[in-house]
Amino acid sequence: MASQGCVDWQFSGSDAAEKAAQASLGTYSSEIFSLCDPQGKPILPPLSEEAETSHTAEKAVVKAVLCGTGNAYAPSIGLPVAKRAVAEYLNRDLDNKLTGDDVYMTVGCKQAIELAVSILAKPKANILLPRPGFPWDMVHSIYKHLEVRRYEFIPERDFEIDFNSVREMVDENTFAIFIINPHNPNGNYYTEAHLKQLATLARELGIMVVSDEVYRWSVFGSNPFVPMGKFSSIVPVITLGSISKGWIVPGWRTGWLALHDLNGVFRSTKVLKAAKEFLEITSKPPTVIQAAIPTILEKTPQDFFEKRGIFLKDKVDFGYSKLKNIPTLTCYMKPESCTFLWTKLDPLHFVDIEDDHDFCRKLAKEENLVVLPGIAFGQNNWLRHSIDMETPRLEDAFERLKSFCERHSVIVEASSLKDVNGVN
């Protein structure tokens, strides 16, 4: 048997992995859920409960399994039929049409983010990310040793991008601005005029736009969704998407990256070549789901998305009305997309709450209610509330939230805080 004496091992865990994990939404989510009591009142939102997907999507996957069309390895850049189907689907909203060659299939939108960051990263480079924003962009930027610069929003103007903050932080090493549209966690989505302003500014600054559009099927506002790819005649655009949110199938792990490049900039700057090379050395999305993609995208009835939108709008209206009775939290706008409410927390309104992280930890311990802290999205003292529950559970969740805030608050009367949106 080998000696068990002291050995100077020449390996250790990655510091980059530890730093990236600290920025991960999953790290915060796991921590908060772990503080709940499984023997107490029902944990809200329920763990691992998902709404029902489209029967068309289910049947498409079953057919792919039974026919064997998804049994083999797919090309590293994706099945040609899946790539063409995505291009044709996106082309419904585009003047400058895509082909299958412009689309790369990925393992969900997360790998699409990783791909976008990896193929563009260079020494000393920096990228503009939203504050707040979904943290996967931050995680992968940390791994690639990119400098992250956070641009701001204007809450009082329905969370429009603060273009002044963008202009101020760009230098010769900035290569892209990353947007989330529709936005998680703000719950807004951008008008055509605002996106055109962004494209014009990006062109002026010499940077590309990367747009995460995974929530495009979860829009329930009065205005139509406008994809960033519509402005590829002004600036090179990369759009990211997947079926996870629109079809409520995050476990199917299938997404894409699309290059909108009317003027051939991606080819001349070797972005196309880098994308193909990156995908040669990474995992591929399930072939069986790729084989089903054409039917999923083409045949899913529109009323599936309409019913989902009605459900989400109803829950947003309900949750927003309940927040009016919790004066310690401020909701600047009623969301028009996604599945969350985003509220500002002022610790000065509480007796014993230090910040958003402390709020969420204590809420989980006392009420078995999971709300995620804004720090998980890069913004201190904000909270993200899930509304993707049936009404009885949602009512229970907001009653628990209200009780918790009343116990810890220095504010007694609900009327003592101004409602920034008025009665709605």
Swiss-Prot record:
GO terms in the biological process aspect are: amino acid metabolic process; biosynthetic process
Q: Which InterPro entries match?
A: Aminotransferase_I/II_large (IPR004839), PyrdxlP-dep_Trfase (IPR015424), PyrdxlP-dep_Trfase_major (IPR015421), PyrdxlP-dep_Trfase_small (IPR015422), TyrNic_aminoTrfase (IPR005958)
- Give the family from UniProt: Belongs to the class-I pyridoxal-phosphate-dependent aminotransferase family.
Q: What is the originating organism of this protein? A: Arabidopsis thaliana (Mouse-ear cress)
* Gene Ontology molecular function, alphabetical: pyridoxal phosphate binding; transaminase activity
Cofactor section? pyridoxal 5'-phosphate
Question: Key word Transferase present in the record?
Answer: yes
Q: What is the E.C. number?
A: 2.6.1.-
Specify the protein name: Probable aminotransferase TAT4
The UniProt entry, under Pfam families, shows:
Aminotran_1_2
Record keywords: Aminotransferase, Pyridoxal phosphate, Transferase
